[in-house]
Structure formats: structure tokens, C-alpha cells
A protein has these predicted regions:
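Acidic-glycine-rich active-site phosphate/pyrophosphate-binding loop
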Residues: 59-61, 67-69, 173, 210, ...
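N-terminal amphipathic/basic leader segments beginning at the initiator methionine
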Residues: 1-36
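Residue-level signature of catalytic and energy-coupling elements of molecular machines
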Residues: 14, 66, 179, 249, ...
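Glycine-rich phosphate/pyrophosphate-binding loop regions near the starts of catalytic domains
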Residues: 27-188
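Short, acidic (Asp/Glu-rich) active-site segment that either coordinates a divalent metal cofactor
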Residues: 65, 156, 169-215, 220, ...
């Protein structure tokens, strides 16, 4: 090819930069690997030794795929990329654990306008940290460079995870009974939902991410970037120790809509707002954006990141176990006769 001819590098794709990113992320990824992981990163496929599944009576493989939505824009604006990968793991594995499945391994996909090796490695480092928190291996991934489609500082990411659960330990609507107690597990904040609305509120109110807001007590950007809490190990420990009938991961659609997904057609969940006070970030967004309460509850988790439906005899034990594990939990409501709906009643207590 002549010096003036077309080339992949001239089109904006830097293969060498991708190779450098892989080299920089290698140590972080290796920390997620247990003895089941065969080989390291760089192969065409990730390999996982599933021999122990042969000891299970009827193993069911479970899979989940998700992303972090437009929370990536917050990371891009702040130039901080170390925790957005934790968000990704939380969104994926905590959907997986809802059915009682133990996460085994995860893969990721990062697409960007320009591969900056240090930035990609920082993102993957967060994914690896999240996998350690979740107890699963990061066995593969892809970094794609899309010049002209994404700006040089823009990126998106997604991931998929696979887990396993015994068929007779499967959680969900079939196990939920009238009289069960619904426990709320506190979120770490917004998690990774509703950020398109968040950004609209910030833009309309002309708020910068470095703004110090009295109602938050911390810089706005730091509050918004707080990583999603990963509940996987806590939920699995709870299911081992207590009569858990269902979990619900509170993501897009809010508390009521997600709890309704794990209800049988002849039962309702009655959820009491007076049982908890949403963290200040939710009140800040509602006030600064003039967002009504119905919209807030439909978009955001409002301080409840996961729910557990447990047998009433085990409710106190479950709360105690979660407390020991550092997860704030409380009785949020109960299961009653009904038609498969979740209903929020009462009013939140005002924050003192």
C-alpha cells in the first residue's frame, strides 16, 4: 500500500492500543479467576470447568445480560472510570441471583470511539472488582473501537453472566405464599437506573457535577457515581440460612413493578412507605426537577435495591443475618390475597 493509501489506523482503529489495554487489565482480571477458569485472557473463548455441576441433582443454568444505561455519561463527564464496571456487574449478577442462581462467570463488552488503554483498563478493573464482590470469574470480553460512531471520549458497556441453581431450589412466584414477609434491602443510592432523567434535571437546573449541595453533604458527581450495591453473595447466604421464597432486583420500573414480577397470580404485595426514608439524593432530584412522587417511584429504586420474600417465621433471622453482613434490611410489607399486584401504601417519614 502506498503511503497515501487507506489504512485501518487512519480510519481511527488502533489495534496496538487494544493490545496495550489487554496487557494493562491482565492483573486485575486474574484476581477473579478460581481453579475452574482454564487459561487466561486473550483466547478466542473463555473456558470454565463445570465438573462440579455433575454433583448436582438437576442443575439449571441461568443467564442474564444488562448494561448501565446512561450512567456512563456521568463517568465520562467526571473523567472517572473506576466504578462504572462495578455498576455493570451489579446490574447483571443481581438479576441472576433473583432466581437463586450462584453466579459462575461473566463476560463484558466495551465499545468506544477511541481506545485509550489506561481508560479501558480502569473500566475493566472495576468490572473485575465487581466480579470479586459477586464471587464470579471474569473469563472474557471484547473492546471494540467505533470511530465516527462514538466520540473519542465516549463509550458504552454491557455484560452477560451465567450461573447455576438446583431445580428444586429455584426461587420465584411458585414459592411465594400469603403471609410471607417482604424485606427491603437498602440501596447504595441511585444504582444504575434513571440517569436519562437525572441528566435532564441537572441540565435544566444548570447543576455542575462538582456542585456542593447542602441536601447531599457531598459533591453531586460523587453521589451520582456511587457504585451499585452488589447483593449476590448476601442473597445466596440468606437463601442458604432462611426460608426465602423470592427476591426482586429493584431496577427500571421501580419498587412496585419489580416486586410484582415475582408474585403468583393470586397474591398481592402490600408495601409500606412508612417503613423507610429514601436517601437525600432522591429528594434532591424530586425537588430540583419538580418530579412528582409517582414518577419518582416508577423510575428510581427510592432507597430499596433488592427485596426478599421470606417465611414469616424467618423474618427476624433474615434481618439479623443481613445486618451481620453489613446490609441494612427491614420489614417492608407482606404478601396478601390478591391478583398479582404490588401496591405501595402510606407515606415516607420526613428525614430529620
Amino acid at each position: 500500500m502506498s503511503a497515501s493509501g487507506a489504512s485501518y489506523a487512519a480510519s481511527g482503529v488502533d489495534i496496538e492500543a487494544g493490545d496495550r489495554a489487554v496487557a494493562l487489565m491482565r492483573a486485575a482480571v486474574s484476581k477473579t479467576a478460581g481453579p475452574e477458569v482454564i487459561g487466561g485472557i486473550g483466547g478466542f473463548a473463555g473456558l470454565f470447568d463445570a465438573s462440579r455441576l455433575a454433583m448436582m441433582r438437576r442443575p439449571l443454568l441461568a443467564t442474564s445480560t444488562d448494561g448501565v444505561g446512561t450512567k456512563v455519561v456521568i463517568a465520562q463527564r467526571m473523567g472517572s472510570y473506576g466504578t462504572i464496571g462495578i455498576d455493570l456487574v451489579g446490574m447483571v449478577v443481581d438479576d441472576l441471583v433473583v432466581c437463586g442462581a450462584e453466579p459462575l462467570f461473566m463476560t463484558d463488552y466495551i465499545v468506544c470511539g477511541k481506545v485509550v488503554p489506561e481508560r479501558v483498563a480502569e473500566i475493566v478493573g472495576g468490572i473485575a472488582e465487581g466480579c470479586v464482590l459477586a464471587g464470579c470469574a471474569l473469563i472474557g470480553g471484547e473492546t471494540a473501537e467505533h470511530p465516527g460512531h462514538f466520540g473519542p471520549d465516549e463509550f458504552d458497556l454491557a455484560g452477560a453472566a451465567t450461573g447455576v441453581v438446583e431445580a428444586d431450589s429455584l426461587l420465584g412466584p411458585g414459592q411465594v405464599k400469603v403471609g410471607d414477609v417482604v424485606l427491603g434491602l437498602a440501596s447504595s443510592g441511585l444504582h444504575s437506573n434513571g440517569f436519562s432523567l437525572v441528566r435532564q434535571i441537572l441540565d435544566d437546573a444548570d447543576l455542575d457535577l462538582d456542585a456542593e449541595l447542602a441536601e447531599l453533604g457531598s459533591p453531586l458527581g460523587a453521589e451520582l457515581a456511587t457504585p451499585t450495591r452488589i447483593y449476590a453473595r448476601d442473597c445466596l447466604a440468606l437463601a442458604q440460612a432462611c426460608q426465602v421464597h423470592a427476591f426482586a432486583h429493584i431496577t427500571g420500573g421501580g419498587l412496585a413493578a419489580n416486586v410484582a414480577r415475582v408474585l403468583p397470580p393470586d397474591a398481592d404485595a402490600l408495601l409500606n412507605r412508612a417503613s423507610w426514608t429514601p436517601p437525600p439524593v432522591f429528594g434532591m432530584l424530586a425537588g430540583r426537577g419538580s418530579v412528582d412522587s409517582d414518577e419518582m417511584e416508577h423510575v428510581f429504586n427510592m432507597g430499596v435495591g433488592m427485596t426478599a420474600v421470606v417465611a414469616p417465621a424467618d423474618a427476624d433471622k433474615a434481618i439479623g443475618l443481613l445486618t451481620q453482613r453489613g446490609v441494612l434490611a427491614w420489614p417492608l410489607g407482606e404478601i396478601a390475597d390478591g391478583s398479582g399486584r404490588a401496591e405501595l401504601t402510606g407515606r415516607h417519614h420526613e428525614r430529620s
